[in-house]
């Protein structure tokens, strides 16, 4: 899988990032997301693969494209056996977020990117559109920190693993009212807090790289993005744990469902019998081979955003593989035609 479609999935996230970046700073988050979805889907359908969206833009009735269960790739056609190899006919699961951080793009803020993860069929946890309590930490702290422990305890462990003082640590937390207590505890423990509006996949990913000045991600965010983060962290050897949140009172928003009871019933219908289970990265992304790809839309910790110039655009992407055990950063110059359709320069 790595050798067959590795380069092509980079192009998938590049196309999504370029399309979305054209709307950076225009205050139209829905449009920035819609064009990214369209570009990502179009490029996916040019790949010789038999893909199935397991994490996407929502349920079929709510999302016209890249909905959960949608089949993508040339080899999903009825006569695919005539022009696809046996390897290409193997089913793969795909988790996507064509524009992670739509508000960031709309308001010209840092940290937005186009992301996807792929694995063989059954290799990615089909997370419901719920929230998830998350803990991400550097590889040195893998298996030592634990989401069941307090933030203070985990900060002490991370500091010891990195041979640093707690006062040197920076923890990323999403700026939400539900995190007021967590933020207070982190600061009282002596660490620093970097608040973000959106985009916790980028924050989780940054924990696994030295020199980013991000040492942990804590708090509650979207569950689908948790699976994508887990895929990246598994490939990077970093620590990631997640626990589904089904109680609207904890999240303090009405976006999770009408009630705790209805959410529990929905989880049971999905086959999730233990709603309080703590998931490790290896459970959320359990496939033998997992690939993660991302491309910066706006400037971020690991990648610069899309930069336009007369006649073209330059992007920075990365691809991470559990198969080859590599992290590749890709700096690409694209030539743009009159319709702003990106074509890679050779």
Swiss-Prot record:
Keywords recorded for this protein, A-Z: Calvin cycle, Carbohydrate metabolism, Hydrolase, Manganese, Metal-binding
Residues annotated to bind substrate: 100-102, 131, 176-178, 198-200
Enzyme class: hydrolase
Pathway noted in the entry: Carbohydrate biosynthesis; Calvin cycle
Record carries keyword Manganese: yes
BP-aspect Gene Ontology terms: fructose 1,6-bisphosphate metabolic process; gluconeogenesis; glycerol metabolic process; reductive pentose-phosphate cycle
Single GO MF descriptor: metal ion binding
Cellular component aspect of the GO annotation: cytosol
UniProt feature coiled coil, ranges: none
InterPro entries membership: FBPase_class-2/SBPase (IPR004464)
Catalysis performed (reactions): beta-D-fructose 1,6-bisphosphate + H2O = beta-D-fructose 6-phosphate + phosphate; D-sedoheptulose 1,7-bisphosphate + H2O = D-sedoheptulose 7-phosphate + phosphate
Pfam family, one: FBPase_glpX
Binding positions for Mn(2+) 2 per the UniProt entry: 97, 100, 225
Residues the record lists as binding Mn(2+) 1: 33, 57
Keyword Manganese: yes
Cofactor names: Mn(2+)
EC number: 3.1.3.11, 3.1.3.37
Superkingdom in the source lineage: Bacteria
Family indicated by similarity: Belongs to the FBPase class 2 family.
Subunit structure: Homotetramer.
PANTHER family: FRUCTOSE-1,6-BISPHOSPHATASE 1 CLASS 2-RELATED, FRUCTOSE-1,6-BISPHOSPHATASE CLASS 2
Function: Catalyzes the hydrolysis of fructose 1,6-bisphosphate (Fru 1,6-P2) and sedoheptulose 1,7-bisphosphate (Sed 1,7-P2) to fructose 6-phosphate and sedoheptulose 7-phosphate, respectively.
Protein name, entry field: D-fructose 1,6-bisphosphatase class 2/sedoheptulose 1,7-bisphosphatase 1
Organism ancestry: Bacteria, Bacillati, Cyanobacteriota, Cyanophyceae, Acaryochloridales
